[in-house]
Regions:
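Contiguous beta-strand/loop segments that form the cofactor/metal-binding neighborhood of enzyme cores
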Residues: 1-53, 58-157
Length: 157
């Protein structure tokens, strides 16, 4: 009852780059998780099934990546980690991890509030989504009605 069955967020960056991020997970529908990056020379489409396509602005296919014969990104990440450990090096993904997490938080804020969210708004927000007191007896903030149905969430409300 507390999550939307679909989301759409448009991320705009200072460089002028735009990312359209969308997902749908409604029962009985085509499920879709997709990011589309729009740049000055073309469009990158990152589908949830791992296929990446790059097209110019006229729609001509410039590149198609199919991951069938490649290692998973998780394995690549582990290979880099193990190599770093063996060589005595270190991997510091702190900044990219924090930025990616903040991007997700901002996307969630925009989707649920229906408002434009900018970095400063989000980083200075005092929104708290966690109940004050959590115990095994804490009631969820939203409960179903007498028919077991939840109120439908509406952006901005």
């Amino acid at each position: 009852g507390e999550i939307f069955d679909h989301h759409y967020v448009e991320f705009k960056y200072p460089s002028g780059a735009v990312i359209h991020s969308q997902c749908r997970h409604q029962p009985g529908t085509v499920r879709n998780v997709n990011e589309v990056l729009v740049g000055t020379k073309g469009v990158v489409n990152l589908s949830g099934n791992g296929v990446v396509k790059i097209n110019d602005h006229n729609g001509s296919l410039l590149h198609k990546y199919d991951p069938k014969n490649d290692l998973s990104p998780y394995q690549i990440e582990h290979n880099k980690l193990f190599k770093s450990i063996r060589s005595g090096g270190q991997i510091d993904d702190t900044e990219i991890g924090a930025t990616a997490t903040m991007t997700a938080i901002m996307g969630r804020m925009a989707t649920y509030t229906g408002k434009l969210i900018e970095w400063d708004n989000a980083i200075n927000s005092d929104d708290n989504l966690v109940p004050e007191n959590i115990s095994w007896n804490t009631k969820p903030p939203v409960l179903p009605d007498q028919n077991g149905k939840y109120k439908i969430p509406i952006p901005g409300k």
